Amino acid sequence: MKKVEIFTDGACKGNPGPGGWGVLLRMGKHEKELSGGEPETTNNRMELRAAIEGLNALIEPCEVELYTDSKYVVDGITKWVHGWKKRGWVNASKKPVRNDDLWHDLIEAELRHKVTWHWVKGHNGHAENERADRLASEAADLQS
């Protein structure tokens, strides 16, 4: 399996409001940047979308180190999702899971790969996270 690093971020101008997502893919010396946005969304949806788009950009199954500054994404995919599935997609408070459409997409995107999830502190000088943040912010600006 090829080894790939993915750095993701989401941004929103207002929450909800215009939003964007950014991804930096790295395999060895090769890098690719991806971004996109939506006119009316939330920060959490853009964080999820960034991870989904990053994983879906990989043509073949890969060993992935995915870095995000979103504890929501990391905790959701590594901890909470198991309980949500058991409870029929309701949270511990018996309320429907928010963004369940994107959680389903993320689970599907993750299946093909061996993914290790990493949380990094945002806006803390992590060069690749800063690049993903810039891509997400630029994409959000294009939506407003």
Curated annotation (Swiss-Prot):
Q: What does this protein do?
A: Endonuclease that specifically degrades the RNA of RNA-DNA hybrids.
Catalyses which reaction(s): Endonucleolytic cleavage to 5'-phosphomonoester
Per UniProt, subcellular location reads as: Cytoplasm
Q: How does it assemble?
A: Monomer.
Instruction: Note the HAMAP family from the entry.
Output: RNase_H
Which residues are in the RNase H type-1 domain?
1-141
The residues listed in the UniProt record as binding Mg(2+) 1, with positions renumbered to this chain, are D9, E47, D69
UniProt cross-references to SUPFAM superfamilies, sorted A to Z: Ribonuclease H-like (SSF53098)
PROSITE patterns named in the record: RNASE_H_1 (PS50879)
One biological process term in Gene Ontology: DNA replication, removal of RNA primer
Cofactor(s) this protein cannot do without:
Mg(2+)
Tell me how the cofactor is bound.
Answer: Binds 1 Mg(2+) ion per subunit. May bind a second metal ion at a regulatory site, or after substrate binding.
Protein family according to the UniProt entry: Belongs to the RNase H family.
Entry's EC annotation: 3.1.26.4
Under the heading Gene3D superfamilies, the entry gives: Ribonuclease H-like superfamily/Ribonuclease H (3.30.420.10)
Q: Which GO terms describe its cellular component?
A: cytoplasm
Q: Which Pfam families match?
A: RNase_H
Q: Which residues bind Mg(2+) 2?
A: D9, D133
Q: Under which name does UniProt file this protein?
A: Ribonuclease H
The organism named in the record is: Erythrobacter litoralis (strain HTCC2594)
Q: Which residues form the signal peptide?
A: none
Tell me which UniProt keywords the record has, alphabetically.
Cytoplasm, Endonuclease, Hydrolase, Magnesium, Metal-binding, Nuclease
Kindly report the protein's main subcellular placement as a broad class. Answer: cytoplasm
